[in-house]
Amino acid sequence: MNSFSAFSEMFGSDYEPQGGDYCPTLATSCPKKPAGRKKFRETRHPIYRGVRQRNSGKWVSEVREPNKKTRIWLGTFQTAEMAARAHDVAALALRGRSACLNFADSAWRLRIPESTCAKDIQKAAAEAALAFQDETCDTTTTNHGLDMEETMVEAIYTPEQSEGAFYMDEETMFGMPTLLDNMAEGMLLPPPSVQWNHNYDGEGDGDVSLWSY
């Protein structure tokens, strides 16, 4: 039994196409706008929505909340397809039938969370990604057919995160892999000393007030 079969048995077929009247909007029919950053390497997947590649070669997924500027972080995955499935289930949970999907069958093959709570969406995204994981991945499968190894889905969410939590990858945004490290090191450096090269008769090395200028 493959991962998807186990996934279907666990969650049923509540999301099968109904009467063939629903035709989801696909990412392939909505070309992406060129990125405005010309000096930085493009990290977005050329086709899949909500999918970006890290410098390590892994793929991350996130989804924008409707009518907000915040995004819900969905996780880090081994393949772009897993990240794309994670985005699809999140998009369906937040936008329903108006969601733009990476795969047409996501509309009826994925378990949609009952609420739009960030934690519920993140959990459903992880389940969807693992159910459609690449068969070439050498992983161990649990009795339910879902691979729950940390190497497959990393940093999905923590209990401390609020429902409105979102993720921003500054290192990828600014094209500087060591941006945060450099900032941290800079904060540890002492401030430069101020030397005054002025001679005042009878004053020697006395302090000079900034307001005297």
From Swiss-Prot:
Which compartments does it reside in? Nucleus
Where it mainly occurs, coarsely classed, is nucleus
Q: Name one GO cellular component term.
A: nucleus
* Pfam families in alphabetical order: AP2 (PF00847)
Q: Which GO terms describe its molecular function?
A: DNA binding; DNA-binding transcription factor activity
DNA-binding region residue numbers: 47-104
Q: What induces or represses expression of this protein, per its UniProt record?
A: By cold stress. Subject to degradation by the 26S proteasome pathway in freezing conditions.
| Keywords per UniProt | Activator, DNA-binding, Nucleus, Stress response, Transcription, Transcription regulation
Q: Name one GO biological process term.
A: response to cold
Instruction: Give the motif span (Nuclear localization signal).
Output: 32-44
Q: Which CDD domains match?
A: AP2
Outcome reported for the amino acid change (mutating T178S): In strain: cv. Cvi-1
Provide the function of this protein: Transcriptional activator that binds specifically to the DNA sequence 5'-[AG]CCGAC-3'. Binding to the C-repeat/DRE element mediates cold-inducible transcription. CBF/DREB1 factors play a key role in freezing tolerance and cold acclimation.
Which family does this protein fall into?
Belongs to the AP2/ERF transcription factor family. ERF subfamily.
Subunit structure comment from the entry: Interacts with 14-3-3 proteins GRF1, GRF3, GRF5, GRF6, GRF7, GRF9 and GRF10 in the nucleus upon freezing.
The entry's protein name is Dehydration-responsive element-binding protein 1B
Species: Arabidopsis thaliana
Q: What is the lineage of its organism?
A: Eukaryota, Viridiplantae, Streptophyta, Embryophyta, Tracheophyta
